């Protein structure tokens, strides 16, 4: 049911987005938003495989638990479905490549190529990659410069969609940018 205020709000949201992002679809929760993004990636690509970051949390519905290592690798979890591949969390504080490594973003992004290959070996084409632009459940991590833009380039080359889960970190919460992906110059690569 459409109300004029919804249209006004959609216009206000669109005004904060890069010009090529022109549509809004309102849902009632972050879980529902990510479930919809998962369905759209599959419909667009005709494939099922998803790449997720280690420690990620994307919601509490069945579909979003399937793409949330925080849940499926936690107590009571059943592990990753065979159509999900976990990529290394780009964590310059605790990870393999630190703040002192100018190429850390590119090095972490290279793991996505491994993940694409692992999905293919199991017979799954890539539908998409989902990540919080600033992983919150993973530790409130600011990824190294160039990480997301490099990942997005690889994912798009493989025919997948790039999903920025901005539920906890978007909408102006980061200060310098309205959306977390903007801090990584990752909206269109």
Annotate each language-model stretch with its function:
Residues 1-189:
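Conserved N-terminal phosphate-binding loop of PLP-dependent enzymes in the Aspartate aminotransferase
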């Amino acid at each position: 049911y459409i109300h004029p205020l919804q249209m006004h709000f959609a216009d206000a949201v669109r005004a904060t987005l890069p010009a090529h992002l022109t549509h809004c679809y309102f849902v009632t929760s972050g879980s529902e938003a990510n479930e919809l993004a998962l369905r759209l990636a599959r419909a667009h690509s005709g494939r099922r495989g998803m790449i997720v970051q280690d420690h990620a949390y994307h919601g509490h519905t069945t579909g979003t638990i399937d793409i949330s290592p925080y849940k499926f690798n936690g107590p009571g979890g059943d592990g990753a479905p065979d159509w999900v591949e976990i990529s290394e969390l780009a964590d310059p504080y605790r990870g393999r490549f630190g703040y002192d490594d100018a190429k850390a973003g590119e090095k972490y992004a290279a793991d996505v190529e491994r993940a694409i290959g692992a999905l293919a070996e199991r017979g799954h084409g890539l539908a998409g990659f989902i990540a919080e632009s600033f992983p919150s459940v993973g530790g409130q991590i600011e990824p190294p410069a160039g990480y997301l833009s490099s990942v997005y380039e690889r994912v798009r080359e493989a025919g997948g969609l790039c999903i920025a889960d901005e539920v906890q970190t978007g909408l102006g919460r980061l200060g310098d940018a309205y959306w977390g992906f903007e801090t990584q110059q990752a909206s269109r690569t």
